[in-house]
């Protein structure tokens, strides 16, 4: 691995480590997303805590955290594998941020950015899948999980297995991070889109 590739991966991780949910809630003088609602510093919890505007800002920044480094890797290296690894590092930064004690979000919004950066078709697959599941079930977590699996595995059909591997690893990590959501979906206790923030319960 040359210096350029290494620098891009480090940049992706560090950018991913900037937790927009925590910063946005601080700016809007809202409770910390780590102590209210689900306890997850992500877009869905910010929506429950502060409404649409803070949530939209959080979502946009989290998407850009994935999009920007992947596009940079794509343009500067022209190497699909390095670009896919850049996506993985951005996700790792978001989920395990060095700036916030390695305790971050669940990576879904950042994944959207990486997918659009890697291939707009993959990004579109994610968004369409998420919307379809969300409209039918009103479960944000279920929508994210289904869209993550379908979009990540779709890379296999557009690239070779080596390039797809980082995205498959991302899917596994996101599934593991949603373990609590999966358990509540099975038990019927998972929060739905539009529910207000309650005591910390580790939902999406």
Curated annotation (Swiss-Prot):
The chain crosses the membrane at residues 8-28, 53-73, 81-101, 116-136, 155-175. One of its GO terms (molecular function) is acyl-phosphate glycerol-3-phosphate acyltransferase activity. It is a multi-pass membrane protein. Keywords: Cell inner membrane, Cell membrane, Lipid biosynthesis, Lipid metabolism, Membrane, Phospholipid biosynthesis, Phospholipid metabolism, Transferase, Transmembrane, Transmembrane helix. Belongs to the PlsY family. GO terms for biological process: phospholipid biosynthetic process. Probably interacts with PlsX. Catalyzes the transfer of an acyl group from acyl-phosphate (acyl-PO(4)) to glycerol-3-phosphate (G3P) to form lysophosphatidic acid (LPA). This enzyme utilizes acyl-phosphate as fatty acyl donor, but not acyl-CoA or acyl-ACP. InterPro entries: G3P_acylTferase_PlsY. This is Glycerol-3-phosphate acyltransferase. It comes from Francisella tularensis subsp. novicida (strain U112). Pathway: Lipid metabolism; phospholipid metabolism. GO terms for cellular component: plasma membrane. It is found in: Cell inner membrane. It catalyses: an acyl phosphate + sn-glycerol 3-phosphate = a 1-acyl-sn-glycero-3-phosphate + phosphate. Its EC number is 2.3.1.275. The keyword Acetylation does not apply. It holds the Pfam family G3P_acyltransf. Disulfide bonds: none annotated. It comes from the Bacteria. SMART domains: G3P_acyltransf (SM01207).
């Amino acid at each position: 691995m040359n210096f350029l590739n290494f620098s891009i991966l480090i940049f992706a991780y560090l950018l991913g480590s900037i937790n927009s949910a925590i910063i946005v809630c601080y700016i809007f003088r809202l409770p910390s997303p780590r102590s209210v609602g689900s306890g997850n510093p992500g877009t869905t919890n910010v929506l429950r805590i502060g409404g649409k505007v803070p949530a939209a800002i959080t979502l946009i920044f989290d998407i850009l955290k994935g999009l920007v480094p992947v596009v940079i890797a794509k343009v500067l290296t022209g190497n699909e594998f390095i670009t896919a690894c850049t996506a993985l590092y951005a996700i790792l930064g978001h989920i395990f941020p060095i700036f916030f004690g390695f305790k971050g979000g669940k990576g879904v919004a950042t994944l959207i950015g990486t997918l659009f950066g890697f291939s707009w078709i993959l990004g579109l697959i994610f968004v369409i899948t998420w919307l379809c599941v969300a409209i039918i079930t009103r479960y944000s977590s279920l929508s994210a999980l289904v869209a993550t699996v379908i979009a990540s595995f779709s890379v296999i059909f557009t690239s070779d297995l080596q390039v797809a591997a980082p995205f498959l690893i991302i899917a596994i990590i996101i599934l593991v991070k949603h373990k609590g959501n999966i358990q509540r979906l099975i038990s019927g206790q998972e929060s739905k889109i539009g529910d207000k923030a309650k005591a910390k319960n580790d939902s999406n």
